[in-house]
Amino acid sequence: MDDKEKLPIIIKHWIEHNESHLEEYRQWAGKAGEMGLDGIKAWITEAIKAMEKSDSILKEALKDLEAR
Protein backbone atom coordinates (compact mmCIF):
# COMPACT_ATOMS: atom_id res chain seq x y z
CA MET A 1 0.00 0.00 0.00
CA ASP A 2 1.46 3.35 -0.99
CA ASP A 3 1.11 6.64 0.85
CA LYS A 4 -1.74 7.82 -1.39
CA GLU A 5 -3.76 4.75 -0.37
CA LYS A 6 -2.81 5.17 3.30
CA LEU A 7 -3.75 8.84 3.53
CA PRO A 8 -7.57 8.45 3.68
CA ILE A 9 -7.18 5.64 6.22
CA ILE A 10 -4.97 7.83 8.39
CA ILE A 11 -7.30 10.83 8.15
CA LYS A 12 -10.31 8.66 9.12
CA HIS A 13 -8.32 7.35 12.08
CA TRP A 14 -7.44 10.87 13.21
CA ILE A 15 -11.11 11.91 13.04
CA GLU A 16 -12.25 8.87 15.04
CA HIS A 17 -9.43 9.35 17.53
CA ASN A 18 -10.32 13.01 18.05
CA GLU A 19 -14.01 12.19 18.47
CA SER A 20 -13.24 9.63 21.17
CA HIS A 21 -11.24 12.27 23.05
CA LEU A 22 -14.00 14.86 22.62
CA GLU A 23 -16.39 12.73 24.65
CA GLU A 24 -13.90 12.54 27.48
CA TYR A 25 -13.20 16.28 27.30
CA ARG A 26 -16.92 17.02 27.55
CA GLN A 27 -17.22 14.78 30.60
CA TRP A 28 -14.29 16.48 32.32
CA ALA A 29 -15.51 19.95 31.43
CA GLY A 30 -18.76 19.04 33.18
CA LYS A 31 -16.91 17.68 36.19
CA ALA A 32 -14.76 20.80 36.39
CA GLY A 33 -17.94 22.88 36.38
CA GLU A 34 -19.44 20.74 39.14
CA MET A 35 -16.29 21.33 41.22
CA GLY A 36 -16.69 25.07 40.81
CA LEU A 37 -13.66 25.26 38.52
CA ASP A 38 -15.36 27.46 35.95
CA GLY A 39 -12.09 28.79 34.53
CA ILE A 40 -10.83 25.25 33.92
CA LYS A 41 -14.17 24.31 32.40
CA ALA A 42 -13.82 27.29 30.05
CA TRP A 43 -10.32 26.20 28.98
CA ILE A 44 -11.48 22.65 28.31
CA THR A 45 -14.50 23.98 26.42
CA GLU A 46 -12.15 26.09 24.30
CA ALA A 47 -10.07 22.97 23.56
CA ILE A 48 -13.27 21.15 22.56
CA LYS A 49 -14.13 23.90 20.08
CA ALA A 50 -10.63 23.79 18.61
CA MET A 51 -10.76 20.01 18.22
CA GLU A 52 -14.21 20.20 16.62
CA LYS A 53 -12.79 22.73 14.15
CA SER A 54 -9.86 20.40 13.49
CA ASP A 55 -12.26 17.52 12.82
CA SER A 56 -14.28 19.69 10.46
CA ILE A 57 -11.14 20.55 8.50
CA LEU A 58 -10.01 16.91 8.40
CA LYS A 59 -13.46 15.86 7.14
CA GLU A 60 -13.21 18.42 4.34
CA ALA A 61 -9.74 17.14 3.46
CA LEU A 62 -11.05 13.57 3.38
CA LYS A 63 -14.01 14.60 1.22
CA ASP A 64 -11.66 16.36 -1.20
CA LEU A 65 -9.31 13.37 -1.27
CA GLU A 66 -12.15 10.91 -1.92
CA ALA A 67 -13.44 13.08 -4.79
CA ARG A 68 -10.14 12.67 -6.64
Model-predicted regions and their roles:
Residues 28-64:
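Short, charge-rich amphipathic interface segments used for partner binding and complex assembly
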Residues 1-29:
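N-terminal acidic leader/helix
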Residues 66-68:
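Short acidic DE-rich linear segments
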